[in-house]
Amino acid sequence: MTFTLLPAVDVVDGQAVRLDQGEAGTEKSYGSPIAAALKWQEQGASWLHFVDLDAAFNRGSNHELMAEVVKNLDINVELTGGIRDDASLKRALATGARRVNIGTAALEKPEWIEKVLGEYGDAIAVDIAVRNIDGQWRTRGNGWVSDGGDLWEVLERLDSQGCTRFVVTDVSKDGTLSGPNIDLLRDVSAATDAKVVASGGISTLEDVLELARYEDEGIDSAIIGKALYEGRFTLKEALAAL
């Protein structure tokens, strides 16, 4: 099985944190991001998911720290948070990151994201964060606080623009340890030829194994955050279970 697990390092003001449903102000700190990243590498991670939450919330940047983390690791890193134009994208890629995830700008700048996808191919993934509002899945931007349009319309557009990978988060699940939204992930995967990365809600090894069962449907990886930091299971255990 080639299902990939990406331990997450979310950073606020230079510290590794986790949020509850992505809300600013709900941070719980877990110390040094570099120490966390090295720990996940040691436990066998082949990829790391690194999020600059200050950049995502438009209130600063942890770019130097991101570059330091990438430099100190021998594994693949995907960076996300605040990538909204050519300058921030080039800066992120210059760290040596293997992949850069773009969220808000993919919703708000359709012409720019089409150009970027054409230029950089699978070095770019698109973050699709959603909330169910009155029975309809709506995409979320700007640190998950603004509406970015109907999920299925956004997916159709980005699919036609050449996106090869979507990172899909049900915001109501993120940081809650309440289990992933399998139905949503499968529906998204069925609607696109792109690969889907599951994000949000994983709390048990059973959650990981259930997601991995849908690898042949296009869900080929999962991001794990709070479950690892809270010691629900170790990355080593999760990788061994796969």
UniProtKB/Swiss-Prot annotation:
It catalyses: 1-(5-phospho-beta-D-ribosyl)-5-[(5-phospho-beta-D-ribosylamino)methylideneamino]imidazole-4-carboxamide = 5-[(5-phospho-1-deoxy-D-ribulos-1-ylimino)methylamino]-1-(5-phospho-beta-D-ribosyl)imidazole-4-carboxamide. GO terms for cellular component: cytoplasm. The active site is at residue 10. The keyword Cytoplasm applies. Keywords: Amino-acid biosynthesis, Cytoplasm, Histidine biosynthesis, Isomerase. Its EC number is 5.3.1.16. Its main location: cytoplasm. It is found in: Cytoplasm. Pathway: Amino-acid biosynthesis; L-histidine biosynthesis; L-histidine from 5-phospho-alpha-D-ribose 1-diphosphate: step 4/9. One of its GO terms (molecular function) is phosphoribosylanthranilate isomerase activity. GO terms for biological process: L-histidine biosynthetic process; L-tryptophan biosynthetic process. It is an enzyme of class 5 (isomerase). Belongs to the HisA/HisF family. PANTHER family: 1-(5-PHOSPHORIBOSYL)-5-[(5-PHOSPHORIBOSYLAMINO)METHYLIDENEAMINO] IMIDAZOLE-4-CARBOXAMIDE ISOMERASE. NCBIfam families: hisA-trpF (TIGR01919). This is 1-(5-phosphoribosyl)-5-[(5-phosphoribosylamino)methylideneamino] imidazole-4-carboxamide isomerase. It comes from Corynebacterium diphtheriae (strain ATCC 700971 / NCTC 13129 / Biotype gravis). The gene is hisA.
